[in-house]
From Swiss-Prot:
It comes from Neisseria meningitidis serogroup C (strain 053442). InterPro entries: Dihydropteroate_synth-like_sf, IspG_bac, IspG_bac-typ, NO2/SO3_Rdtase_4Fe4S_sf. It comes from the Bacteria. The keyword Oxidoreductase applies. NCBIfam families: ispG_gcpE, PRK00366.1. This is 4-hydroxy-3-methylbut-2-en-1-yl diphosphate synthase (flavodoxin). Its EC number is 1.17.7.3. Binds 1 [4Fe-4S] cluster.
Length: 421
């Protein structure tokens, strides 16, 4: 069994969630509702939480938004959701925190962007106010630097110094270094202002995969703060999913990254929760965490001209996700369940035996029966028009038997061990 070594960091407590070092990598998401609409925002946070988001960031950009944060927190508490809220501040955060102190108290973490707090002495004062407010309220802070909103005075200073050097670097390399310096210098200022090191998380987001990997490798080697991973804008659909997976998987495999967000551009009509599902699947397929039972299914070939196995695989995946809101509480450990839905005799029986539960559907020209395997043993053979219903009933019974109060697999941990450096 492989062991992934995690980067050793300070551990940051955000309400009931611990971030950093050997703590599990945390999935974060962000609402796209108008925060001033407290009802709609609370409902979307509930939806994101139900999907598996462990922290949710909300925009706090106006007096109307700031005035509703405490109400959003109350609505969530009334619904039984303790999901930590992260306030996303840009440009006017210090004013909003001053005018609406209940906003700062209701949030669990502040996100501050050094690039748009302000310039010169005035900017320093605004940054200091936000940091002191966080410290007074015992809140964590993510100092989040972005490629597109980098502190221009810092960038110019570093560009000028680079031009004056005997061996100037390419401008893009200087910009990457400026991102890192901005984050580290801001963290140093925050500590001097009274914010403990174990209240600080850093991020340096860019939009290109290779740039993100390079920046985070360097940032991770130069500090002991937990790091939040994500592309600034991943894009839409498969492009966004592939880009996020490519970047984050490399860093996570190297032990870099303590919280993640998949910044997908939602396609028209697609649920906001997609970014949460993608984040879960990245962590689960890497063996870092388990969130929901996984379905193994073959890609199909000339032996599987029927779509029956594809439809069953989709039905099973949807069924498992829908049931998890109930199963998670009733059947601890069920998230590690592995189900195989295979399309023909070539790999079907073998993959089905390796899964906790598997079904091998008949391929083209094969006998129209579907053997079901449970814990490696052939259990029953299904046939007829009700294969899907009967197979889901077998899955349901397996979960109740094995993950119930006296189940042999209750609380069984199949996650690859994580060790801190």
């Amino acid at each position: 069994m492989n062991t992934l070594q995690r980067r050793k960091t300070h551990q940051v407590r955000i309400d009931h969630i611990t971030v950093g070092s050997e703590a599990p990598v945390v999935i974060q998401s962000m609402t796209n509702t108008d925060t001033a609409d407290a009802k709609a925002t609370a409902l979307q946070i509930k939806e994101l939480s139900d999907a598996g988001s462990e922290m949710v960031r909300i925009t706090v950009n106006s007096p109307e938004a700031a005035s509703k944060v405490a109400e959003i927190r109350r609505r969530l508490d009334d619904m039984g959701y303790a999901t930590p809220l992260i306030g996303d501040f840009h440009f006017n955060g210090e004013r909003l925190l001053a005018e609406f102190p209940e906003c700062g108290k209701a949030l669990s973490k502040y996100r501050i962007n050094p690039g748009n707090v302000g310039k010169g002495v005035k900017g320093d004062e605004k940054f200091a106010f936000m940091i002191r407010t966080a410290a007074e309220n015992d809140k964590a802070v993510r100092i989040g630097v972005n490629w597109g909103s980098l502190d221009q005075s810092l960038a110019k200073r570093m560009m000028d110094a680079n031009l004056a050097s005997s061996a100037p670097k390419p401008p893009e390399e200087v910009t990457k270094e400026a991102l890192i310096v901005s984050a580290l210098e801001s963290a140093e200022k925050a500590v001097l202002l009274g914010l403990p090191e174990d209240k600080i998380i850093l991020s340096c987001k860019v939009s290109a995969v290779q740039d993100l990997i390079q920046v985070y490798r360097e940032l991770g080697s130069r500090c002991a703060y937990p790091l939040h991973l994500g592309l600034t804008e991943a894009g839409m659909g498969s492009k966004g999913i592939v880009a996020s997976t490519a970047a984050l998987s490399v860093l996570l495999q190297e032990g870099i990254g303590d919280t993640i967000r998949i910044s997908l551009t939602p396609e028209p009509g697609s649920p906001r929760t997609q970014e949460v599902v993608v984040g879960q699947e990245i962590l689960q397929t890497m063996g870092l965490r388990s969130f929901t039972p996984m379905v193994t299914a073959c890609p199909g070939c000339g032996r599987t001209t029927s779509t029956v196995f594809q439809e069953l695989a989709q039905d099973v995946q949807n069924y498992l996700r829908q049931k998890m809101s109930i199963w998670r509480t009733l059947y601890p450990g069920v998230e590690s369940l592995n189900v195989a839905v295979m399309g023909c005799v070539v790999n079907g029986p073998g993959e089905s035996k390796l899964a906790d539960i598997g079904i091998s559907l008949p391929g083209t020209g094969e006998t129209p029966v579907a053997p079901v395997y449970v814990d490696g043993e052939r259990k029953v053979t299904l046939k007829g028009d009700n294969i899907a219903t009967e197979f889901l009933a077998i899955v349901e019974e397996y979960v109740k038997t094995n993950y119930g109060e006296n189940g042999s697999k209750r609380n069984q941990n199949k996650i690859i061990p994580i060790q801190s450096l």
